[in-house]
């Protein structure tokens, strides 16, 4: 049986566990596994781009729903203005008080992004960031992971189920399976990102 949807995953998990009395628990095991792989995977399929306008005098803005990690951020100006990460302490130290201008730095605190200096006008900032995969449910029956890496879902869900079943001897088996599935997926995605070409670093003059 192919594992390519929420329902086929639940059926496969029940079959592999040889249990027919876990229909209420299996969705919980799936959700726990989703929390795990969203923390560790950083794939191209997780990348999103969003454009937001700043407001003059407003220093902080909400991060997008599902935000996991920043990949790149810049102001959509001509030429493009790079915005560099700073720790919160450094951001406050440099731009304390009422200083304002075109943002050149940012920091993340909680679920907000803070700019320094405080924007003095409306600037469009463009974020490329990693977003959590959408969770599977009865109304959202597929996502990228279940279609492209069903082993991550299967092994991870089985791993979450075994402690509930007090079947500790099976935990290392599913743990190894999940670890290998995640490692293989991340390694292949890293290779595909560069299409087999050598990674080069641009110097300060803009040349390789």
In which residue ranges do the predicted regions lie?
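Glycine-enriched, solvent-exposed interface loops adjoining structured elements
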Residues: 1-208
């Amino acid at each position: 049986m192919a594992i390519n949807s929420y329902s086929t995953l639940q059926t496969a998990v029940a079959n592999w566990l040889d249990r027919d009395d876990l229909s209420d628990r299996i969705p919980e095991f799936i959700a726990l596994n989703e929390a795990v792989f969203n923390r560790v995977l950083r794939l191209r399929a997780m990348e999103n781009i969003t454009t937001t306008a700043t407001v003059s005098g407003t220093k902080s803005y909400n991060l997008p729903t599902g935000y996991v990690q920043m990949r790149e951020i810049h102001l959509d100006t001509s030429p493009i203005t790079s915005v560099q990460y700073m720790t919160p302490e450094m951001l406050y130290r440099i731009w304390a008080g009422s200083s304002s201008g075109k943002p050149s730095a940012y920091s993340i605190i909680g679920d907000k992004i803070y700019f320094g200096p405080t924007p003095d006008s409306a600037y469009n900032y463009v974020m490329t960031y990693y977003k959590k995969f959408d969770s599977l449910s009865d109304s959202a029956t597929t996502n990228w992971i279940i279609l492209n890496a069903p082993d991550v879902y299967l092994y991870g869900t089985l791993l979450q189920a075994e402690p509930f079943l007090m079947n500790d001897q099976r935990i290392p088996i599913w743990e190894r399976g999940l670890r290998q599935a995640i490692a293989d997926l991340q390694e292949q995605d890293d290779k595909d990102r560069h299409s087999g070409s050598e990674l080069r670093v641009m110097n300060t003059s803009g040349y390789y």
